[in-house]
C-alpha cells in the first residue's frame, strides 16, 4: 500500500 495515500485517507477520516 502507498504511504502518502494512507496519509491522505487519514486526513479525510
From Swiss-Prot:
Main location: secreted
Subcellular localization(s) per the UniProt record: Secreted; Target cell membrane
Leucine amide PTM positions: 13
Tissue specificity field: Expressed by the skin glands.
Signal peptide (from-to): none
Keyword Ribonucleoprotein on entry: no
Record keywords: Amidation, Amphibian defense peptide, Antibiotic, Antimicrobial, Cytolysis, Hemolysis, Immunity, Innate immunity, Lipid-binding, Membrane, Secreted, Target cell membrane, Target membrane
Molecular function, one GO term: lipid binding
Transmembrane stretches, start-end: none
GO annotation terms (biological process): defense response to bacterium; defense response to fungus; hemolysis in another organism; innate immune response
Keyword Secreted: yes
Gene Ontology CC terms, in alphabetical order: extracellular region; membrane; other organism cell membrane
Coiled coil (residue ranges): none
Function summary: Amphipathic alpha-helical antimicrobial peptide with potent activity against both Gram-negative and Gram-positive bacteria, and against fungi. Mainly acts by causing perturbation of bilayer integrity of both neutral and negatively charged membranes, probably by forming pore-like openings. Also displays anti-leishmania activity by damaging parasite membrane. Shows hemolytic activity. Also shows cytotoxicity against cancer cell lines. Strongly binds to lipopolysaccharides (LPS) and its lipid A portion.
Family listed: Belongs to the frog skin active peptide (FSAP) family. Temporin subfamily.
Subunit structure, interactors included: Adopts monomeric helical conformations when bound to bacterial (anionic) and eukaryotic (zwitterionic) model membranes. May also oligomerize as homo-dimers or -trimers in Gram-negative bacteria mimetic membranes, and from homo-dimers to -pentamers in Gram-positive bacteria mimetic membranes. Adopts an antiparallel dimeric helical structure when complexed with LPS micelles. This dimeric helical structure may interact with the lipid A domain of LPS.
The protein's name: Temporin-1Tl
Species annotation: Rana temporaria (European common frog)
Amino acid at each position: 500500500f502507498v504511504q502518502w495515500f494512507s496519509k491522505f485517507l487519514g486526513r479525510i477520516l
